[in-house]
Amino acid sequence: VIVSWFKKLVPGLVFAILFSALHFGLWALANRALPLINVKPAVNGFAYSGYRGNQSPLDGQHPSTAELAEDLDLMHKHTRHIRMYSSLDLNEVVPLAARRNMNVIAGAWIDTDNQKNTREISALLEKLENYSNIDRVIVGNEALLRNDLPVQSLMGYLDFVREHSNVPVSTAEPWHVWLKYPELVKHVDYIAVHLLPYHEGVPVEKAVQYTIERYNQLMQAYPRKKIVITEVGWPSRGPAIGASVASEVNQARFIREFLARNSIEDLDFYLMEAFDQPWKVALEGWAGAYWGMYNADRHQKYSLQGAVPPNTRWIAKATWSSLLAFIPLMLIAWRFKHWGIGGVLSMAVLFQACITTLTIAWNLPGDYYYTLRDFVVLIGLILGIALTSMVLMIYAAEFSEVMFKPAWRRLFKRAQAVPADQELFVSIHLACYNEPPEMVIATIDSLRHLNYTHYEVIVVDNNTKDEAKWKPLETYMATMPDNFHFYHLPSWPGFKAGALNFALDKTHPDAKVVGVVDADYVVTPDWLSDLVPHFQESQVAVVQAPQAHREWENHFFHRMCNWEFEGFFRIGMHHRHERNALIQHGTMTLIRRESLQTLGGWSEWCICEDTELGLRLLENNMELRYIDETFGRGLTPANFKALKSQRNRWAFGAMQILKHHMPKLLGKSSLNFSQRYHFLTGWFGWFGEALQLVFTIGSIGWTIAMLAFPKYFSLPVVVMIVPILCFLAIKAILGPVLYRKTMHCSWMDIFGASLASLGLSHAIARGIINGLTHKAGVFVVTNKTKAKLSNWQLIDPIKEELLILVSLIMAGAAMLYARGFSNLDAQLWVSMLALQSLPYWSALACQWISERK
């Protein structure tokens, strides 16, 4: 038995080894060490703050004497000079430095607190009396830059200290502050300047030259003053500022190039700084913590000799992501071997991409020093990666469950019809607005022929102004039996929800169940008889049948719409229904009247009142059932404009629901974990469309910037292309595979459904963004009848898509023209622009197909 199992697992084991090796190799390729200029490990001096990762002067947590001694021993390997910032803290440093023959620039921190300033200066002068290894003094650190005090006050402090000091005295400010206040130079013995080109948006390759130029500018302005660079350096982490990019490689490059240049210039300088200081994040933002040659744990971040890898922790990340995925990869290769190599590879790539993305996100706290304040900022930076990872994992979960689960646990069928005297009374509500009367009459006529005894039909026409649309309904309803009722509301608020609430008020007092159908649905006679008996179980609040369509077979656009809709009802609805997290729909739905009225009826503030009601019912511990059998068929949207309008409304309504229900989705409610998961993540695919729109507009803008300002804007291909490729891969691979698995349709129909889905990307993105930024929406009825359009009306539905498409084409052409067709970077960038254009080409194709005869 063991041998038999081993033989079965060998192919999967080999596949997992090869795939993991390839994955690790890609990590190695992306993180190959970069050669930099080699310099001697000698530094003129270090700016020094001795706080460690869990320490901060802001809350009174200071390093011990032993920790300070350890720091000085590390710095002693590189220098004999250090610079301090305050005389009230870390008092052991100066005597510890003296034992190691190290000189100290002592500092007095000056800010808005005059009493504290006095204590700082007193402590500074006391140290000057006691320790001979203090060779310079700095009173104030960027106090003028922060506007903590006027220049006259600072000059007063400087004059006082100079009178009581036997060593040179200065204050530390950036170069431009010294140029702004020439009078300040008369009150110092030397100029203590900060030269930090990162803060000025200078690219790292020009940063050293820029530093020397600013130094020379000060020399020319004040030729008789000695200049000491008391801060010079580059951070290893932080936000991009103009062309300045913070990274360990850039930090190593700047320091090495500066040290090499200093061998010629012979400058008096202090590197900013010896050790990373996480506590500075609270004062200075991200970059403030990451200026050290050593990290907060006292490990050197880079060497001054040899090549430097872009990411020193890549081996750990690659190893963990490979190890975490290894056994699942082996099981994928074994479990899905009947798919063939293509299926196995597609699953493996998807799963490894998920694990790798999550591993990178998980390791970000190890790359950054987290505090409560900067946690939100850091989350913002990794939002793109985290969102992509979550979307991938959500799709992976749905894909795996639908593809491989032998049977659905919650699979309900038609119920056994009950005798007439045991039937629950049903009130069927049909709301319509400005609909073709013949279409609505067909729906009413189908309701007349239901195989059910105890029911009524309430038709509510709200806000239709054209009598030719609602008068025929009134006339036809007058010929119906007494259980058919018609109401015309000339002016009624609340859109469809308002009409349904009106119908609810008019409902027969004996009704136990409320049914809702759209105005275009022709219902089968067995709808009520086969589904209403489910309400005999008291916990059942909703019985939902799928949306289905008719009259779609003879036009390719309607075929596209039909199969695009079918995907959700054959796949997504089952996936959610398995955990009682159903998306309720506003047609072919049956609701327990008591539950509906207890919750206050339909929500008129939401333009997706059906889904919102379903979530409220779930929040009240009720069960929603899905019967995947067709009991009625409606019409597909008449054209692409109508399809876009419908999907835009759904996306907008989804955001209304999320915003309104977020406290219960995240806080205290009766929703279980699975229900919260589905409603919080179920629309993440649509969030991806919004993110893709942002990326696309950003790419166009970035292309323009690269063409207009090539010295300051480079090609961020990897940053932009990864999320786009992920979303496109999901749609291009998972969708067709699931369609082929769950539905009986041709590859052409799968292509059509995929084309429609991709073409709707912009409409969904607009709906998501508008839903997030606006509170109220407008319920636009989906047009189901086609009319002849003018040439402008043919273009109008996709004018935004065309504008973006033309912009992408022009951006790509301009980039190739400017950089040359043989430029590899330009080719990659234009390839990314081409990928980003696919949704807009699809929208153009959908519009053309929808208007064909």
Which residues are covered by each model-predicted region?
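The conserved acidic donor/metal-binding loop of glycosyltransferases
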Residues: D518-V522
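Aromatic-rich peripheral "rim/lid" segments of glycoside hydrolase catalytic domains that contact
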Residues: K40, G45, Y51, P57-G60, ...
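Long helical/loop segments within the catalytic core of UDP-sugar-dependent glycosyltransferases
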Residues: T475-K512, P525-I607, E612, L618-E619, ...
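Membrane-embedded multi-pass helical conduit in multi-pass membrane proteins
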Residues: W339-M390, V418, G685-V778, Q793-K853
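Cell-envelope/extracellular polymer assembly enzymes that use nucleotide-activated donors
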Residues: L424-S427, E456, Q597, E612
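Short, acidic, metal-binding catalytic loop of nucleotide-sugar glycosyltransferases
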Residues: I444-H454
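A conserved acidic beta->alpha catalytic loop
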Residues: T453, D461-L473, P490-P493
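Aromatic- and acid-rich polysaccharide-binding/catalytic face
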Residues: A106, D135, N141, E173-R214, ...
